[in-house]
């Protein structure tokens, strides 16, 4: 059963502010038909808008996000810092998603978790992954893509911060292990963050 419109409004409002169209992928039938009617391929901005609109209006699954781990790259951090950082990102999230005609994954999501300083950090946005099915068993899938979103952190006084990050996943049926890597400098950034995603 679909959740109330208010939750979807939050998802769309966040993601529409932050999507980075240069990375948008072709979406489903609506986008393709629009391009045919105009007799040309859609532009970057139009393709990004179509991906957001199709995911918003034609989502196929709801998703539960459960943060699983945070790992600070030991090659770029002093031990004194990693010893006191939190690497158990308790939290949860919700999203909606669809597969386009190529079988690729598109999502709008919201998630909140405990950050490195054990403070709450919300993030919301749009996610895309190109999907591969390397085995004869089509239930096993690999994904590679990006997420474009907005996050807010306690140590930045909860000022909205745009983010554009790589994303990869390993999926079996409805369960996915999904992760990103936040690049950075010495004692800053360089964090591997992973979560479980369950479709229902």
From Swiss-Prot:
**Active-site positions on this chain:** 72, 115, 116
Output one GO BP term: lipid A biosynthetic process
Which compartment or compartments is the protein found in? Answer: Cell outer membrane
Q: Could you tell me the keywords of this UniProt record?
A: Acyltransferase, Cell outer membrane, Membrane, Signal, Transferase
> Which reaction is catalysed here?
a lipid A + a 1,2-diacyl-sn-glycero-3-phosphocholine = a hepta-acyl lipid A + a 2-acyl-sn-glycero-3-phosphocholine; a lipid IVA + a 1,2-diacyl-sn-glycero-3-phosphocholine = a lipid IVB + a 2-acyl-sn-glycero-3-phosphocholine; a lipid IIA + a 1,2-diacyl-sn-glycero-3-phosphocholine = a lipid IIB + a 2-acyl-sn-glycero-3-phosphocholine
Which molecular-function annotation in GO is an example for this chain? Answer: acyltransferase activity
- Pfam family membership, one: PagP
**The organism sits in which domain of life?**
Bacteria
Per the UniProt entry, the signal peptide is 1-24
In short, the EC number is: 2.3.1.251
What is a single cellular component term in the Gene Ontology annotation?
A: cell outer membrane
Query: Where in the chain is the site Role in lipopolysaccharide recognition?
Result: 81
InterPro entries named among the record's database cross-references = LipidA_acyl_PagP (IPR009746), OMP/PagP_b-brl (IPR011250)
Record text on subunit structure and interactions: Homodimer.
Tell me, what does this protein do in biology? Transfers a fatty acid residue from the sn-1 position of a phospholipid to the N-linked hydroxyfatty acid chain on the proximal unit of lipid A or its precursors.
UniProt similarity note: Belongs to the lipid A palmitoyltransferase family.
Q: What is this protein called?
A: Lipid A acyltransferase PagP
What organism is the protein native to?
Dickeya dadantii (strain 3937) (Erwinia chrysanthemi (strain 3937))
Q: What is the lineage of its organism?
A: Bacteria, Pseudomonadati, Pseudomonadota, Gammaproteobacteria, Enterobacterales
Name the gene. pagP
């Amino acid at each position: 059963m679909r959740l109330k419109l208010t939750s979807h409004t939050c998802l769309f409002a966040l993601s529409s502010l932050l999507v980075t169209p240069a990375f948008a992928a072709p979406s489903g039938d609506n986008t393709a038909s629009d391009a045919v009617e105009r007799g040309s391929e859609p532009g970057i901005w139009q393709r990004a808008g179509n991906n957001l609109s199709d995911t918003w209006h034609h989502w196929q699954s709801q998703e539960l996000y459960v943060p699983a781990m945070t790992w600070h790259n030991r090659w770029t951090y002093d031990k004194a810092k990693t010893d006191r950082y939190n690497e158990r990102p308790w939290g949860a999230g919700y999203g909606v998603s669809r597969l386009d005609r190529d079988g690729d994954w598109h999502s709008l999501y919201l998630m909140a978790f405990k950050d490195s300083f054990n403070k709450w950090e919300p993030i919301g946005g749009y996610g895309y992954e190109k999907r591969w099915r390397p085995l004869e068993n089509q239930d096993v899938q690999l994904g590679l893509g990006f997420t474009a979103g907005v996050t807010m952190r306690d140590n930045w006084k909860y000022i909205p911060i745009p983010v554009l990050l790589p994303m990869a996943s390993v999926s079996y049926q409805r369960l996915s292990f999904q992760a990103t890597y936040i690049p950075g400098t010495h004692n800053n950034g360089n964090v591997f963050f992973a979560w479980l995603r369950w479709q229902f």
